[in-house]
Swiss-Prot record:
<comment type="function">
    <text>Zinc phosphodiesterase, which displays some tRNA 3'-processing endonuclease activity. Probably involved in tRNA maturation, by removing a 3'-trailer from precursor tRNA.</text>
</comment>
<keyword id="KW-0479">Metal-binding</keyword>
<dbReference type="GO" id="GO:0042781">
    <property type="term" value="F:3'-tRNA processing endoribonuclease activity"/>
</dbReference>
<feature type="binding site">
    <location>
        <position position="60"/>
    </location>
    <ligand>
        <name>Zn(2+) 1</name>
    </ligand>
</feature>
<protein>
    <recommendedName>
        <fullName>Ribonuclease Z</fullName>
        <ecNumber>3.1.26.11</ecNumber>
    </recommendedName>
</protein>
<keyword id="KW-0255">Endonuclease</keyword>
<feature type="binding site">
    <location>
        <position position="209"/>
    </location>
    <ligand>
        <name>Zn(2+) 2</name>
    </ligand>
</feature>
<feature type="binding site">
    <location>
        <position position="64"/>
    </location>
    <ligand>
        <name>Zn(2+) 2</name>
    </ligand>
</feature>
<dbReference type="GO" id="GO:0008270">
    <property type="term" value="F:zinc ion binding"/>
</dbReference>
<dbReference type="Pfam" id="PF00753">
    <property type="entry name" value="Lactamase_B"/>
</dbReference>
<keyword id="KW-0862">Zinc</keyword>
<dbReference type="InterPro" id="IPR001279">
    <property type="entry name" value="Metallo-B-lactamas"/>
</dbReference>
<comment type="similarity">
    <text>Belongs to the RNase Z family.</text>
</comment>
<keyword id="KW-0540">Nuclease</keyword>
<feature type="binding site">
    <location>
        <position position="140"/>
    </location>
    <ligand>
        <name>Zn(2+) 1</name>
    </ligand>
</feature>
<keyword id="KW-0819">tRNA processing</keyword>
<feature type="binding site">
    <location>
        <position position="209"/>
    </location>
    <ligand>
        <name>Zn(2+) 1</name>
    </ligand>
</feature>
Length: 308
C-alpha cells in the first residue's frame, strides 16, 4: 500500500503546496481522497494512474477540496475510460456533480455513480474481500466526513492442525478454504478448526477538515488503525483561529494521534500563511519528547509513504 500526497495545502495554494488531494494505492487500484484544483496535473509527476482511480472520496464541498474534479473527470474521458467511477461525499454531492457535468461541453461516456453520505453516525460504505472503507462525520463549517481505509486480512491456514486432523491436500482442503464445512471420519470440520487468527492489516484514517474530535480518535482505535493523516492548518499559537474556522492545530492533530493509538501520523492541509515549518517542527519536538513511539511527518506535495 502506498500513499501519495498530491496536494498538502489549505484554502489558498502556494508555490510549494497545491490544494488537497491524496492518492492511496492498494492491490493495483487507486483510491483518491479529495480532489482540489490542479490534482490532475500533480498526478503527472507521480506514478499514480488516473485510469486506475475507481473510487473518489470527498470530505466536504469547499472549493479547495473539489475544484479539481471537472478537469479530472474530463481528462480520463479523453483517455478512453469506459468503466464506472464511484464518487462518495456528504450531502449535496449529487447536486455538485450535476452542476459539473452541466457546465461546458463535456464528452463523458463512462458512468459516474454518486454516493451521498448523510449519516450522522459512522458507516461502512464499501466492503470487499480485501478491504473496507468507513465514513465518519466530523465537525467543520459545512457537512464534512473523515474516511478510514482498512485492509481485510483473511485467516491463515494452520498446516499443523490440518495434518493433525488427517486432512489431505485436495478437494476437502479446498472446500474448507472456500468456507464450507467438511465431514471427516464422522466429524464436522469447519474453517475455524484449521486456521490461525488473521494478521493485523493496514488501516489508514484521513480526517479531512475538522476540529479535533476525541470520538474520531476512539473510532480509529476501535478499528485498530496504525496510520492517521490529519489536518494541521495552524500552529498552536493560532489556536483561536483554528477554533473560529473549525480547523485543527498541529498539536491538536498530534493529540488525536496519541488518543487513537496509531503508530504514524502525517500532518497535512498547511495554511498558506507559513513560509517555513519551524513552528510545526517545534510542536513535533515537544510531542516526541513524551511520545517517542509515534512517528510524525509533515506531508509535502508529491511525497510518497509506503505501508506494509
Amino acid at each position: 500500500m502506498k500513499i501519495t500526497f498530491l496536494g498538502t495545502g489549505a484554502a489558498i495554494p502556494t508555490k510549494y503546496r497545491a490544494h488537497p488531494s491524496i492518492s492511496l494505492k492498494f492491490d493495483g487500484e487507486i483510491f483518491l481522497f479529495d480532489c482540489g484544483e490542479n490534482t490532475q496535473r500533480q498526478i503527472i509527476f507521480t506514478d499514480v494512474s488516473p485510469m486506475k482511480i475507481n473510487n473518489i472520496f470527498i470530505t466536504h464541498l469547499h472549493g479547495d477540496h473539489v475544484l479539481g474534479l471537472p478537469g479530472l473527470l474530463q481528462s480520463i474521458a479523453f483517455q478512453g475510460r469506459k468503466k464506472p467511477l464511484n464518487i462518495y461525499g456528504p450531502a449535496e454531492t449529487v447536486k455538485m456533480i450535476e452542476h459539473i457535468l452541466g457546465v461546458g461541453y463535456h464528452s463523458i461516456d463512462y458512468p459516474i455513480n454518486v454516493h451521498e453520505i448523510s449519516s450522522k453516525t459512522p458507516e461502512r460504505i464499501i466492503f470487499t474481500n480485501n478491504y473496507e472503507v468507513f465514513s465518519y462525520p466530523v465537525v467543520h463549517s459545512v457537512p464534512a466526513l473523515a474516511y478510514v481505509f482498512k485492509q481485510v486480512k483473511k485467516p491463515r491456514m494452520d498446516l499443523e492442525k490440518v495434518k493433525k486432523l488427517g486432512i489431505e491436500i485436495g478437494p476437502d482442503l479446498k472446500r474448507l478454504k472456500d468456507g464450507f464445512n467438511v465431514e471427516l471420519n464422522g466429524e464436522i470440520i469447519t474453517l475455524n478448526d484449521v486456521t490461525l487468527p488473521p494478521k493485523k492489516g493496514i488501516c489508514v484514517g484521513y480526517s479531512g477538515d475538522t476540529i479535533p474530535l476525541k470520538e474520531f480518535a476512539e473510532f480509529l482505535k476501535e478499528l485498530k488503525c496504525n496510520t492517521l493523516i490529519h489536518e494541521a492548518t495552524f500552529d498552536k499559537t493560532m489556536e483561536r483561529n483554528a477554533k473560529e474556522t473549525l480547523h485543527s492545530t498541529a498539536t491538536d492533530a498530534l493529540n488525536i494521534a496519541k488518543l487513537s493509538g496509531v503508530s504514524t501520523v502525517l500532518l497535512t492541509h498547511i495554511s498558506a500563511r507559513y513560509d517555513n515549518l519551524n513552528a510545526f517542527e517545534n510542536e513535533i519536538v515537544e510531542f516526541k519528547a513524551e511520545n517517542p513511539e509515534i512517528h510524525v511527518l509533515i506531508a509535502e506535495d508529491l511525497m510518497e509513504y509506503s505501508l506494509k
